[in-house]
């Protein structure tokens, strides 16, 4: 049975937190804390003010098994969060042991409420139960009326390192190991000092955050051939649900590589229930491009995590740049799933 809730219902918050905390399938962008920031940002984004939202909880015998946070735009239903930039992964929030039968029954009830509307599920990771369900049944007679399509959305890269640094380093290719040696020798030869700053929890250093967002915006402008980046900086720094989450969430992690006391590269994101950190932002300061700051940052971050006994893989999320694979990265995928209700 589907029951509709409002965002300010304490019962919804409690159900949401319980399902999310117990489920390692889900990414931090599905957490209640992150969704709160999205809701706050939505209030200042004109294009979202008139979008109708629906939050349904699917119950089986009075047991809540799945939350379906949705909004409607131009006669299409989307997962809430798709209308705000920032999230790398979206999903329904469900019991980790939810059965295929329950997912089907929830979709059947949703179809009764929104018959003739297209449901567009974007940024669904391959480990999601939703992806597994649709991949299993999308050509089955069970879902023939839904006209399900599954398309690749984005390639992501994750680094799962060994239990100690020597094992990790020797797991890399000979060419990658040689390149790492060369860049560290170059740093020493040119008297470039390096230091890794790690911020875990709410990011309270406003000056450092501004500095990081400045070169993040500059790098973005270089990539997009944009002449002016002032307004983009203001947006990223002060009017972004992602930045607000970085400033407020306990699960936040930022690794910032300093070269000669200046930020050379940083990656910022959130820990998950899956022994990993997902980084929606990974950026390098182009002023230090000759010193491979991305590789050095990843290398120093892995040393830090191993020294602190934190067995957390690094999901570098957006983009499949070559240096990520040189540092031991492997691909995983996000998908777009569409169906007719």
Task: State each model region's role.
Residues 2-79, 124-133, 137, 145-156, ...:
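A conserved beta-strand-loop-helix scaffold within acyl/acetyltransferase catalytic domains
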Residues 75-152, 274-331:
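Acyl-donor binding region in acyl/amide transferases
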Residues 159-161, 338-341:
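Short beta-strand-to-coil "C-cap" segments at the C-terminal boundary of structured domains/repeats
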